[in-house]
Design a protein with these regions (language model features):
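Transmembrane helical cores of multi-pass secondary ion antiporters/exchangers
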Residues: 1-388, 401
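Cytosolic regulatory regions of ion transport systems
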Residues: 309, 316-323, 327, 337, ...
């Protein structure tokens, strides 16, 4: 089983590279690979446990939604937050009811089943949208990238609420009062727990120091799970809570945030592989011919009527340009969210005449395969690409090329800085003294501040990062090493190597030619 799982993940990684080369969304490749391994595929893996799939996929979707919030840079998103949140909520409702009306009036489905299909496919998929924007680096005009990211991350809770409420009505257990109570509970507990967990997590992160490396990532992972599980346990909207907590934590000033974003990038990437592969595994291609025509009709109506109408009604009053409306309409990708909600409907006790799961599955395949593939070309044809924009700025792992780095230097009695004022020292251009540590005192210096022997001077400069050119390695010196006892200037190294640091008995030494190497030293060497 472990061997098979490893092979599947490796195949997904390989297909990711292949799909990127041919311009196809990677998530489509994961689904198709799942179908290849499934009951009707080449490898005939028997899997039809919808309940198990729903539980796994719901948690996975919670992680994706949390990451959608955590990775969104609010300073960029807040410029378009008002209209985008209206688009996420009202847009999902309008899309659901328009699609439901089409299913009833044109395809002849039952009213409640029609509305259920509309609700299930009413939200855009954060994983699909993020994947296309990042992989294709779509730098879009008028803040459109931020609109798409914020909408796709925040409209899932609305689709979930609609789906839950309609399923309740289909089972005949919903009254007008029960409908209102369910709606209020979803919103109240979702927002309430999201706010409380966010405040508690921020308080702990800022006051608790994690000594062991990686424990901050473990802590945030636990918070993400808690933000979904707690409100869900009391009838609240776990996805709404997840997104709120993700937004708050992702935009709180905490150390190592970029590393956390990259950690969750990896976790979410693995979750997407698991989720989309599992959805493909669950599908039966042999059952699709009977539903391909209604699925195609719904997909066409959704893409060319329902979604554009909802976007136009909401965005035009905010002064959106027609080409921006066209692009936002086309970028309404359906993905894992819709299929997970379809699984939720399938395992529910509500009676349905149609194969909702496979109908939604086909719609998602068409959406990712056609819309996702053509989105970069569509953006270019609409002249929505702006080379002066950078889509990566809308994500929290973006950092400017001129990121500031800090270094500290201890001033020895024989240093030519000792006893001199800062303004009299010829520092290189671009280097700034930002703080002086003197005994237990922290001094914010001016040009007239005098540096004394024993001071620790903190300097800032523009950072440099390029992992393709430099490799750091450690070298331990034992008593038999040929360098032991020699000065740095006396050792012979290759021309592209340099000793950048020496660890000695818990101290960090920045070497010069006069420094003599000793037994037990750990040399940090860089090579080009």
């Amino acid at each position: 089983m472990l061997i098979l799982s490893s092979v599947i993940v490796l195949c997904c990684v390989f297909f990711n590279k292949i799909s990127d080369k041919f311009g196809l969304p990677a998530l489509l490749a994961f689904i198709l690979l799942g179908m290849l391994f499934g009951s009707d595929g080449l490898f005939k893996i028997e899997f039809d446990n919808y309940k198990f799939a729903e539980e796994i996929c719901s948690v996975g979707l919670g992680f994706i939604i949390f990451y959608g919030g955590f990775g969104t840079k609010w300073s960029e998103a807040k410029k378009v937050a008002g209209k985008t949140l209206i688009l996420a909520s009202a847009g999902a409702l309008l899309t659901a009811f328009a699609t439901g009306a089409f299913c009833k009036l044109v395809l002849g489905f039952e009213w409640l089943e029609s509305l259920l299909i509309g609700a299930v496919i009413s939200s855009t998929d954060a994983a699909s949208v993020f994947s296309v924007l990042r992989s294709k680096k779509l730098n879009l005009r008028y803040g459109t990238a931020s609109i798409l990211e914020l909408e796709s991350g925040s409209n899932d809770p609305w689709a979930y609420m609609l789906t839950v409420i309609i399923l309740s009505v289909m089972k005949g257990g919903a009254t007008a009062g029960g409908f209102v109570v369910s709606l209020l509970a979803q919103v109240f507990f979702g927002v309430g727990f999201g706010a409380l967990i966010s405040l508690g997590a921020v308080y702990l992160i800022k006051r608790v120091r994690f000594d062991a490396a990686g424990f901050d990532a473990i802590f945030v992972t636990a918070i993400a799970i808690l933000s979904y599980a707690l409100p869900s346990a009391v009838g609240g909207n776990g996805y709404l809570s997840c997104y709120i907590v993700g937004i708050v934590l992702g935009n709180t000033k905490i150390s190592g945030k970029t590393a956390l974003v990259h950690f969750f990038d990896g976790i979410t990437g693995f979750t997407q592989i698991l989720l989309f592969f599992l959805l493909g595994l669950l599908a039966f291609p042999s059952q699709m011919p009977s539903i391909i025509l209604p699925a195609a009709a719904i997909a066409l109506f959704l893409t060319f009527v329902a979604r554009p109408a909802a976007v136009t009604v909401i965005m035009k009053p905010f002064g959106a340009k027609w080409k921006q409306i066209a692009l936002i309409s086309w970028a309404g990708l359906r993905g894992a969210t819709s299929i997970v909600f379809a699984i939720m409907a399938t395992v529910d006790d509500a009676y349905m005449k149609n194969d909702v799961f496979h109908i939604v599955f086909c719609i998602v395949l068409m959406s990712i395969g056609i819309q996702g593939t053509l989105l970069p070309l569509f953006a270019k044809k609409l002249d929505m690409i702006d080379d002066e924009e950078n889509v990566m700025k809308t994500f929290n792992d973006y950092s400017d090329e001129t990121e500031v780095q800090f270094i500290k230097l201890s001033v020895q009695p024989d240093s030519n800085w000792a006893g001199r004022k800062i303004k009299d020292i010829p520092f290189p251009r671009g280097l700034l003294v930002v703080m002086i540590l003197r005994d237990k005192e922290k001094i914010i210096p001016t040009g007239k501040t005098q540096i004394l022997a024993g001071d620790v001077v903190v300097l800032s400069a523009a950072g440099f990062y390029d992992d393709s050119h430099f490799v750091l390695s450690e070298m331990n010196l034992d008593k038999h090493h040929e360098w032991c006892g020699l000065k740095v200037s006396e050792i012979t190294m290759s021309e592209d190597s340099l000793i950048v640091m020496i660890k000695r008995q818990g101290r960090i030494l920045i070497p010069n030619g006069r420094l003599r190497l000793k037994e037990g030293d750990v040399l940090v060497v860089t090579s080009g």
